[in-house]
A protein has these predicted regions:
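N-terminal beta1-alpha1-beta2 module of alpha/beta enzyme domains
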Residues: 1-73, 177, 279-289, 294-297, ...
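A structural motif
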Residues: 36-39, 106, 196, 270-273
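Hydrophobic faces of well-ordered beta-strands that scaffold small-molecule active sites
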Residues: 6-10, 42-44, 78-81, 109-113, ...
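Active-site mouth loops of central-metabolism enzymes
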Residues: 10-25, 82-92, 174-184, 245-259
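Conserved, mostly hydrophobic/aromatic
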Residues: 34, 38, 46, 70, ...
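Flexible, glycine-rich active-site loops centered on histidine and acidic residues
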Residues: 5-22, 84-154, 202-211
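An alpha-helical appendage that flanks or caps ligand/catalytic pockets
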Residues: 1-2, 10, 35, 126, ...
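Alpha-helical segments flanking ligand/cofactor-binding loops in enzyme cores
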Residues: 25-28, 32, 68, 99, ...
Length: 301
């Protein structure tokens, strides 16, 4: 059985009614403490701006910059993008970014990648494309994957191009940076089956294995369809967690005593997931510390 990994999505967005902004000294302290606690991967989300219907905009620090800073601050834990949006950047530059982050981390980088999205208004606010998102992603993959797997890309598409483009310089793992493709839909799973080391979904409505578990059978079927052994792809689940709130606080987040949170993580492992990545609320050191007994319980099994 593959090892079961637990990751932490770093709190780099404004949070709470007062839109509290986590500052770098706090983010750095959280990263170091999470590494010491034994988290397997620290992820930085790649969002730009959230516009809530009932409140002011919610800002987010740049995820790539934060990934580099976290990688330079830590020494053992893996560091990844969760997930880097192909909608925000040129695909050749995305591949170079991944190579650079692997260099900064000394070979600890996990390249989380996704199609991106237009909601809730961030694409429009930044003047980014709002249409044909998956068509754009398919073209981006025809540049990114060859660059990180063979060191070269040559492609001319409707939305993207790479003309005799070499992947230079290269970091400590030429052609071998692990690729995670995120997305709940069939298209995301198919791209993962074709190109990625790991597929990851995320629980939107309920922080429960019943929401994401059925997608594993779909992933297996897609792997069979494209001629891939389903056992060769990792399976991730992103779930929200608030260890400072009582059990049953919200259906979209796991909460309550450490044993109850640990039981939820175990249920994902038993369903066949190889990793869970925890989206922490609130983004404080106190909340991270409250997860220490959860990790101990799951690791003790």
């Amino acid at each position: 059985m593959a090892p079961f990994e637990i990751g932490l999505v770093m709190p780099i967005a404004q949070f709470g009614p007062e839109r509290t902004t986590p500052r770098w000294p706090v983010i750095r302290e959280i990263a170091l403490r999470a590494e010491a606690m034994g988290f397997d991967t620290l992820w930085t989300p790649d969002e730009l701006l959230w516009r809530a219907e009932d409140g002011p905009p919610q800002g987010v620090w740049d995820g790539v910059s934060m990934a580099g800073a976290v990688a330079a601050t830590t020494s053992r834990v893996k560091v990844g993008t969760w997930v880097l949006s192909a909608l925000h950047r040129n695909p050749g530059i995305i591949a170079k970014t991944a190579e650079t982050l692997d260099e900064i981390s000394g070979g600890r980088f996990v390249f989380g990648l996704g199609a991106g999205h237009e909601w809730p208004g961030q694409a429009r606010a930044f003047g980014l494309p709002e249409d044909r998102i998956f068509a754009r992603f398919e073209e981006a993959l025809r540049i990114i994957v060859p660059l990180i797997r063979t060191g070269h890309a040559d492609f001319e598409g409707q939305y993207h191009a790479a003309r005799d483009l070499p992947q230079q310089p290269v970091g400590p793992r030429p052609n071998a940076i692990p690729l995670l493709i995120g997305g709940n839909g069939l298209k995301g799973q198919r791209h993962a089956a074709l190109h990625a080391d790991i597929w990851s979904g995320y629980a939107e409505e309920r922080a429960h294995v019943d929401e994401l578990g059925p997608r594993l059978a779909t992933l297996d079927a897609i792997c069979d369809e494209v001629g891939r052994d389903p056992a060769t792809i990792g399976r991730g689940a992103g779930i929200s967690v608030n260890p400072l709130q009582p059990a049953g606080w919200r259906p979209t987040a796991i909460s309550g005593p450490a044993e109850e949170i640990a039981d939820t993580l175990r249920s994902f492992r038993e369903a066949g997931f190889t990793q869970v990545d925890l989206m922490l609320g609130p983004g404080t050191l106190e909340a991270v510390e409250a997860l220490a007994p959860v990790l101990e319980l799951v690791r003790a099994d």
